[in-house]
Amino acid sequence: NNISIKSEKKLPNVLSPDEIDKLIDFYNHDLFISSRNKTIIDFMYSTGCRVSELINVEESDIDIEEAFVRLEGKGSKQRIVPLGSKVLINLESYLPLRNKDRKSKNNKLFISKSYKNLDRTAVFRIIKSTGVKAGIHKELYPHILRHSAATHMLEGGCDLRTVQEFLGHSSVSTTQIYTKVTKAFLEEAFIES
């Protein structure tokens, strides 16, 4: 089981759990757009999904009762991802606002205020602008939520195989980049203590 890591790969940027909370908690569920943005950020972090997976999730892919979502990843590979209690609460608050006064038959979970599909650039804008408004002084993009989810899972003691399944990586060597991030985190924590 000799797995080598390509060392020229840049380590992914990661947000702290506090920064993740700042992003999610920036919004409330008072209005549709605010609720949608809050739920998008929480959903991306909680499921570790890619932008392409997020914009293609349909309402029928969510099972609130059983607390899971069906995601379609790269190469049309499907995976089932559990939904934690926090993201479930956000989904339960978002869905009635999403479906109120529905003027279209769009089945996508996350839609624009004109009931159209969200595209990748819209998601990039949401993440970037939320970071600025929430006072997070880092370059933000949707994939940072996926990187953060994987890193936090490993830091919390999750094994590499589970993280691999969670992210939908076909090879564990792809997932191993996060062990380097975690190692860097541990070294930094050790130096600071």
Where are these regions (language model features)?
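Conserved catalytic core of the tyrosine transesterase superfamily
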Residues: N1-S193
